A protein has these predicted regions:
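Extracellular/lumenal glycan-associated surfaces
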Residues: 3, 21, 163-175, 179
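Short, recurring structural edge motifs at helix starts
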Residues: 4-9, 140-141, 150-159, 174-177, ...
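Non-catalytic DNA-recognition/assembly elements of restriction-modification systems
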Residues: 6-29, 206-215
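Proline-centric
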Residues: 8-13, 109-116, 148-161, 166, ...
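DNA target-recognition domains and sequence-specific DNA-contacting regions of bacterial/archaeal
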Residues: 20-156
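Hydrophobic topology marker
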Residues: 186-189
Length: 215
């Protein structure tokens, strides 16, 4: 399903694609906390509690050493192409990685392919979160697996149209951040209303329908 309103110059239909076809889903790992040689290194290592409302992840609270990294199942995630995605204990908190880093087991992060715009996918994360929460399972706490997340199907336009939409949301997020700083957390209501209405799960596959100019 494609949006009713689109940027001019993009006539091609949107296509349903599995998330696993546009991104590699990567889990994490934790070195032994009993070995001091594994900690206080220079490799960023994230836990779910560190993700909140920020768009970007710049620096983790804890870091591990190369020995710690080698000792566990953590994977180094590339900067600029990775969306951290919490998979339990609060499913669907996200941030775009600005520095190469790894995570603990509480993530199923999305490393987008070269033909996919990272900010476009980031603009979809509320819908991805909604899917993940519906598919999550577990007796102790709900969790979505990498395989389960990869199976989610969403509508995608061409890379150029993704970039146009992603750029629009990037500008909106930047303006929201500026207003938050200026007014001590109070963002411009117009931008907040547009962003929230666009990213609500009930507007699935229509991320540009309420905000994208046609000219």
């Amino acid at each position: 399903m494609e949006p009713e309103i689109r940027f001019a110059g993009f006539p091609a239909p949107w296509e349903q694609r599995k998330l696993g076809d546009v991104a590699t889903i990567v889990g994490g790992g934790t070195p032994s906390t009993n070995n001091d040689a594994y900690w206080d290194g220079d490799i960023d290592w994230y836990s779910p509690a560190e993700l909140g409302e920020q768009v970007y992840a710049d620096r983790s609270a804890r870091r591990i050493t190369q020995a710690g990294y080698d000792s566990c199942s953590a994977t180094l995630l590339p900067a600029g192409k990775t969306i951290l995605f919490t998979s339990r204990a609060g499913i669907g908190n996200t941030a775009i990685l600005r520095r190469s880093a790894c995570t603990n087991q509480g993530f199923q992060s999305l490393v987008v392919n070269d033909d996919t715009d990272v900010y476009f996918v980031y603009s979809m994360t509320d819908r991805i979160k909604n899917f993940a929460e519906q598919k999550a399972s577990g007796s102790t706490f709900l969790e979505i697996s990498g395989k389960g997340l990869a199976a989610g199907e969403f509508a995608f336009p061409s890379k150029d149209e993704q970039t146009a939409i992603g750029s629009m949301f990037k500008q909106l997020d930047h303006l929201i951040t500026l207003h938050q700083r200026k007014y001590d957390g109070c963002a411009n209501p117009l931008f907040l209303e547009r962003r929230i209405s666009c990213r609500k799960p009930s507007h699935q596959n229509r991320c540009s329908a309420t905000t994208t100019p046609s000219g």
